[in-house]
Amino acid sequence: MSLHQFLLEPITCHAWNRDRTQIALSPNNHEVHIYKKNGSQWVKAHELKEHNGHITGIDWAPKSDRIVTCGADRNAYVWSQKDGVWKPTLVILRINRAATFVKWSPLENKFAVGSGARLISVCYFESENDWWVSKHIKKPIRSTVLSLDWHPNNVLLAAGSCDFKCRVFSAYIKEVDEKPASTPWGSKMPFGQLMSEFGGSGTGGWVHGVSFSASGSRLAWVSHDSTVSVADASKSVQVSTLKTEFLPLLSVSFVSENSVVAAGHDCCPMLFNYDDRGCLTFVSKLDIPKQSIQRNMSAMERFRNMDKRATTEDRNTALETLHQNSITQVSIYEVDKQDCRKFCTTGIDGAMTIWDFKTLESSIQGLRIM
């Protein structure tokens, strides 16, 4: 595991470039900072300044090398690099509330933006007018959209929202998409078609994170009631929900067809397993706790505590986990959702950690990624 403390401020969101030599992140304001790997150090290479509200989402397209950002100013920008300079192009989202989340489609010919306007803007490039336009998915969303993920077929889109529901929509756009083949989620896919809807019958919570598996037949989501759920379209959309004893999880990703990593307010990533019988189980926390050492306090530390915490007591407030505050995002760092070797987390503590499954398997007894 390698931890890098980028900021004192929270990292709102992050995205990696294709070869993982650069990371784009937002330091909880209206800017995007791009850091470049230089040996073992991360050096700030660019600052993207066009938004005038907090940035809420970043995604970096691996093939076309374009960055898309969205923010509380109700705007989205597509950034392209020319002669070493990042240039923004405004996207017409047509929303009257903050944008909350953005995600490129697998073929990078469109992207989806969630918002507080109770809708999803699916944006694509109109070459005859030379601009990005959007189509809206509105019904039956009843509240802010918090999270999105694309199906590998480039057409289906999963959305988690504050109305306690996780939904799968068709985001088929005839201008840019070929006619999609039938999937286990359904065969008729006109734009905006609701393919599946889960949760919300008097129970549940805000759906903070959603993730399709590499095959696209499974969908995982995490909710504010501390549950993890997986729906399996190949088993006639059977849903397995696991009520955990942890604080709510905020982000989730498949790391193999049967394994899911999620993280949130407990400050450490957790591994869950979904077997072929449709049973969802908690496997392990993926953070090895540091041993706290009892020792005398130096005068320097006593004064520092007076300054920082208005106390001279030796109360160790550091958490035993690597992250010292909630983890807000989990992303794949090495390989893909089919066979993830390393994954990355960023959090409110301003830190970024890269987790290596090989190292974790050797240090946590009985841990195996299925």
From Swiss-Prot:
Segments crossing the lipid bilayer: none
Location(s), subcellular: Cytoplasm, Cytoskeleton; Nucleus
Highest taxon of the lineage: Eukaryota
Matches recorded under Pfam families: WD40
GO biological process per UniProt: actin cytoskeleton organization; Arp2/3 complex-mediated actin nucleation
Gene Ontology MF terms in the entry: actin binding; actin filament binding
Repeat positions for WD: 6-45, 50-89, 140-179, 202-241, 244-284, 322-365
Gene3D superfamilies: YVTN repeat-like/Quinoprotein amine dehydrogenase
A Gene Ontology term for the protein's cellular component: Arp2/3 protein complex
UniProt keyword annotations, A-Z: Actin-binding, Cytoplasm, Cytoskeleton, Nucleus, Repeat, WD repeat
Key word Hydrolase present: no
SUPFAM superfamilies, per database record: WD40 repeat-like (SSF50978)
Keyword presence, Membrane: no
Described function: Probably functions as a component of the Arp2/3 complex which is involved in regulation of actin polymerization and together with an activating nucleation-promoting factor (NPF) mediates the formation of branched actin networks.
Subunit structure: Probable component of the Arp2/3 complex in which it may replace ARPC1B. In addition to its role in the cytoplasmic cytoskeleton, the Arp2/3 complex also promotes actin polymerization in the nucleus, thereby regulating gene transcription and repair of damaged DNA.
UniProt family annotation: Belongs to the WD repeat ARPC1 family.
Official protein name in the record: Actin-related protein 2/3 complex subunit 1A
Highest classification ranks of the organism: Eukaryota, Metazoa, Chordata, Craniata, Vertebrata
